[in-house]
Regions:
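N-terminal, motif-rich segments that launch catalysis or mediate targeting to/interaction with membranes
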Residues: 1-81, 94, 99-148
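Short, intrinsically disordered, charge-balanced linker/junction segments flanking boundaries
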Residues: 3, 85, 152-156
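Short, glycine/charge-rich beta-strand/loop segments that flank catalytic centers
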Residues: 80-88
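Active-site His/Glu-centered metal-binding helix of metallohydrolases
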Residues: 87, 91-95
Length: 156
């Protein structure tokens, strides 16, 4: 994909690949704060639901906030890579969600038990797709080194 980007952007994303990959997973991070996909905790789940706009909120406001905030920070290239990854997640969700929903059931089912099962299947399928694409790129989850990026600067 890097070859299809303007050269300076491709080089920036290559230089800050960890930040890019971290951004590409960030919208779903709070979904993973669960013992199993079947036991999502409401407090963590609501954060990702809000980031995805499922609460009826505008799901792009925080992106504009991040872009505005980035202008005031040191190491703008690292934050740009993170935001580019974040936007790639949104693009992938836009493309893949119709298929994921059709395979996993009604995410908003009126029956709480079926809704819980559908959401668990949704997360398992998305995680499987993530891991498949990661393996196709020749990378491993451990090799991304994302945990080293969890230090948030004080000025953020």
């Amino acid at each position: 994909m890097r070859e299809k980007l303007p050269r300076d952007v491709g080089e920036l994303l290559h230089s800050h690949a960890q930040e890019y990959f971290f951004g590409s997973t960030a919208p779903d991070l709070f979904y993973y704060d669960v013992p199993t996909p079947f036991d999502a905790t409401p407090s963590s789940e609501i954060i990702s639901e809000t980031l995805h706009g499922r609460m009826g909120n505008k799901n792009n406001e925080h992106i504009f906030w991040m872009l505005d905030r980035m202008k005031k920070l040191d190491q703008q290239d690292r934050y740009f890579a993170f935001i580019a990854g974040y936007l790639s997640h949104i693009a992938a969700d836009t493309i893949f969600h119709p298929m994921v929903y059709s395979r996993t059931g009604n995410y908003f089912d009126q029956d709480p038990a079926e809704r819980k099962r559908s959401r668990a299947r949704h997360r398992v399928l998305e995680t499987s797709l993530d891991l498949y694409l990661l393996s196709k790129s020749g990378r491993t989850l451990r090799g991304l080194g994302l945990l080293g990026l969890l230090k948030v600067p004080e000025d953020f």
